[in-house]
Amino acid sequence: MIALIQRVSRASVTVEDEVTGEIGPGLLVLLGVEKDDDEQKANRLCERVLGYRIFSDAEGKMNLNVQQAGGSVLVVSQFTLAADTERGMRPSFSKGAAPDRAEALYEYFVARCRQQEMNTQTGRFAADMQVSLVNDGPVTFWLQV
């Protein structure tokens, strides 16, 4: 399971001219689900995303996680993160989970974030989405479990 996380000043996702999720300061989480992923990996990734210390403390050091910084999370499904790009000029998506399984794990990940009392907004699984963000830093990390 892969999360590309970006520290943002604000972010939103729109589907068919409807804003489905919008946050102020926090994390934009682009989430990719691979074939061998399961609930245990989703739990671990959720723990890492919410606990990752990439927000500045009073001394300007990256020492606070999103919860400590009072931020929110916007989770957007992105199957292209599971692409195999090692060869050729066209990505292969053979490493990605089947759509039904990917959606179930995406929803599970979102539920785990919400269980941690995290303000969690979302896109719409498998939809054509427009994601807008202001990357703060920029600060972007690839987390994989």
Swiss-Prot record:
Compartment annotation: Cytoplasm
One of the record's GO molecular function terms: Ser(Gly)-tRNA(Ala) hydrolase activity
Motif Gly-cisPro motif, important for rejection of L-amino acids location, chain numbering: 137-138
A cellular component term, taken from the record's GO annotations: cytoplasm
Keyword Cytoplasm: yes
Chief location: cytoplasm
Alphabetical GO biological process terms: D-amino acid catabolic process
Pfam families tied to this protein: Tyr_Deacylase (PF02580)
Protein EC: 3.1.1.96
Keywords, sorted A to Z: Cytoplasm, Hydrolase, RNA-binding, tRNA-binding
Function field: An aminoacyl-tRNA editing enzyme that deacylates mischarged D-aminoacyl-tRNAs. Also deacylates mischarged glycyl-tRNA(Ala), protecting cells against glycine mischarging by AlaRS. Acts via tRNA-based rather than protein-based catalysis; rejects L-amino acids rather than detecting D-amino acids in the active site. By recycling D-aminoacyl-tRNA to D-amino acids and free tRNA molecules, this enzyme counteracts the toxicity associated with the formation of D-aminoacyl-tRNA entities in vivo and helps enforce protein L-homochirality.
Quaternary structure, from the entry: Homodimer.
Domain topic, free-text comment: A Gly-cisPro motif from one monomer fits into the active site of the other monomer to allow specific chiral rejection of L-amino acids.
PANTHER family: D-AMINOACYL-TRNA DEACYLASE 1 (PTHR10472:SF5), D-TYROSYL-TRNA TYR DEACYLASE (PTHR10472)
Entry protein name: D-aminoacyl-tRNA deacylase
